[in-house]
Amino acid sequence: MLSRRTLLQLMGGVSALAAGAGAAPVFAADNIRVAMVVKALGIGFFDACRDGGLEAAKELGGVELIYTGPTKTTAEEQIAVVDSLIAQKVDAIAISANDTNALVPVCKKAMSRGIKVISFDSGVAPEGRIMQLDPSNTALIGAKCVQMIAKTIHNEGDVAILSATAQATNQNAWIAEMKKEWAKPEYAKMKLVATVYGDDVADKSYREAQGLFKSYPDLKGIIAPTSVGIVAAAKAVVDAGLVGKVYVSGLGLPSEMKGAVLAGATDTFAIWNPIDLGYTATMIAALIAMGKATGAPGTTIHAGRMGDIKIGPDASAAMADPFTFDKSNIEKFSKIF
C-alpha cells in the first residue's frame, strides 16, 4: 500500500494533472480504448475519477478513455452498459460495481471476448475480473469512520449509518469493518441504532436522513460512507435546524462538503484522492491491455506518478490511507477536488 497522503502530496496530484498535459507519452499505444464504468453518471466523486483517467490516457499516449455508466445505481443498468462496450469491442474495462456478484456473468463474457476487465472502488467478485483496485485499506476506512464520529460526540450517543445501495461492495465491506471497530470497549456508550440506504440518490438519501431524525429523537450522529449520502444528510441536518445536535461524518469530497463543515453540520470527514484513483485504474487497465502488465497476484505494476502498485495474493491492491478534512483545511482542499 502506498504511504499516507500529506497535504503536499494531495495537491501534487492536481499539479501533475496540469503538467501531464504537455508531457511526452510513456508508451506509444495503438488506439487502446479503455472504458471507465462508474456506479452512476452525475456523481462528483466519479467525475473526479474521470479527470484522473483522462490524465493517465494523455500520459500513456494513444489511449482513449470512454467514461460511461448508468443513470441509476443498479446492477441491471450497469450490465447493459457493459454489454454495449462488448459490442463496441473496447480493449479494457475498469468498473466500479453496483453489485459484486450480479456483474460477474457480463464481465466474464467481456473477458471471453478478449477485453481486459478490472474493478476499482467497488469490486466485482474475483471470478469476474483480473484484479481489484481499492482506494484505501478497507479496515482503515471502517475504523476511521467510527473514530471520526466518536471524537465529535465524545464516544456517547445514538448513531446511524446512511449507506449507498444495500448491494454496494465497498460500502458493505466498510460497514463490516465499522462494526468491528465499534465492538471496542471505548465505544460502549455509542449505540448503532440503524443502517439505512439512500441508493446514492440525493433525494432518497435526504429523506432517509429525515426518517432517522423522526425514528430516533436522541440521534447524535450519522455516518455516511458515500459522497452522495454525506452531502444529503448534512443538508437534512441544516434544514431541520439540528446543527449542534446531530453531526454527520463519513466519506465525501471537500468541494461538496465545504458548506456542511462551515455550517457546523459536519465536524470531520475523510476521503482519498479520487483523481489519483481514476488515474491509477485507467493506467493499470491500459497497461494490461497493452501487455505491459498482467495484474496477477504477486506482481507489481508501475502506475506512472503513483509509483509501484503491488498486487496482493487475492488479486487486489490498495492505495492511500484516508485523509481527514475539517475547518482547518477545507478551504484549501475544496479548490482541488
Segment roles from a protein language model:
Residues 1-14:
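N-terminal secretory signal peptides and thylakoid transit peptides that target proteins
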Residues 78, 133-159, 173, 204-206, ...:
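Hydrophobic alpha-helical segments within soluble ligand-binding/sensing domains
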Residues 45-59, 141-145, 169-189, 204, ...:
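Short, solvent-exposed amphipathic alpha-helices that sit
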Residues 100-140, 147-151, 158, 164, ...:
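Flexible loop/hinge segments that line or gate small-molecule binding clefts
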Residues 30, 166-170, 181-183, 284-337:
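Hinge/cleft segment of the Venus flytrap/periplasmic-binding protein
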Residues 33-60, 66-82, 90, 96-100, ...:
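Extracytoplasmic "Venus flytrap"
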Residues 59-70, 184-200:
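Short beta-strand elements in bilobed, periplasmic/extracellular small-molecule ligand-binding domains
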Residues 92-111, 178, 194, 198-260:
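Hydrophobic alpha-helical
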